[in-house]
């Protein structure tokens, strides 16, 4: 192989290796910013047929309804604890900060944070639905057939 061909081959290999490295580093950086959406029952029992549960420490978003009577505020700080439920289960959410003005018991909510235990989320952000006629598509699909009421087992404080 002649010298110019070797030089050209090395240059092409260097460009390909650089492109592969760039793509790999970009995908690695983006993976830490992905927040998967779960309903309370998917956190407890896993998603669909795969029964894949989120791992402890995983960043995620949970959507559902705020259980009436579950909101507890700390008198010494901005910490708020509440329960988010859907048709098959409920999870506890802890949030330290100012809640949105439209946050209410019995309303739809999406909490973004880290799964602390099997049924507890430490939220970094809480979003409340902003219009009485609007429900985010993820929550609407998860709550279908439930008519906005907590199932009896959930309202009695049982984990389904």
Curated annotation (Swiss-Prot):
GO terms for cellular component: plasma membrane. One of its GO terms (molecular function) is metal ion binding. Pfam families: CcmE. GO terms for biological process: cytochrome complex assembly. Coiled coil: none annotated. Signal peptide: none annotated. Heme binds at residues 130, 134. The chain crosses the membrane at residues 9-29. The keyword Transmembrane helix applies. Residues 1-8 are cytoplasmic. InterPro entries: CcmE, CcmE-like_sf, NA-bd_OB-fold. It is a single-pass type II membrane protein. It is found in: Cell inner membrane. Residues 30-160 are periplasmic. Belongs to the CcmE/CycJ family. PANTHER family: CYTOCHROME C-TYPE BIOGENESIS PROTEIN CCME HOMOLOG, MITOCHONDRIAL (PTHR34128:SF2). Heme chaperone required for the biogenesis of c-type cytochromes. Transiently binds heme delivered by CcmC and transfers the heme to apo-cytochromes in a process facilitated by CcmF and CcmH. This is Cytochrome c-type biogenesis protein CcmE. It comes from Pectobacterium carotovorum subsp. carotovorum (strain PC1).
């Amino acid at each position: 192989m002649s010298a110019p061909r070797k030089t050209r081959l090395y240059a092409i290999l260097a460009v390909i290796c650089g492109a592969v490295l760039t793509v790999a580093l970009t995908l690695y950086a983006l993976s830490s910013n992905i927040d998967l959406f779960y309903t309370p029952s998917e956190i407890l029992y896993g998603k669909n047929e795969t029964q894949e549960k989120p791992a402890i420490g995983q960043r995620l978003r949970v959507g559902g309804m705020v259980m009436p009577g579950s909101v507890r505020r700390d008198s010494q700080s901005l910490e708020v604890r509440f329960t988010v439920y859907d048709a098959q289960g409920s999870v506890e959410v802890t949030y330290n900060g100012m809640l949105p003005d439209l946050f209410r018991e019995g309303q739809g909510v999406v909490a973004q944070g880290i799964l602390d235990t099997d049924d507890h989320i430490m939220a970094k952000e809480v979003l409340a639905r902003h219009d009485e006629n609007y429900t985010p598509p993820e929550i609407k699909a998860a709550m279908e057939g439930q008519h906005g009421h907590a199932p009896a087992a959930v309202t009695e404080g049982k984990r389904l």
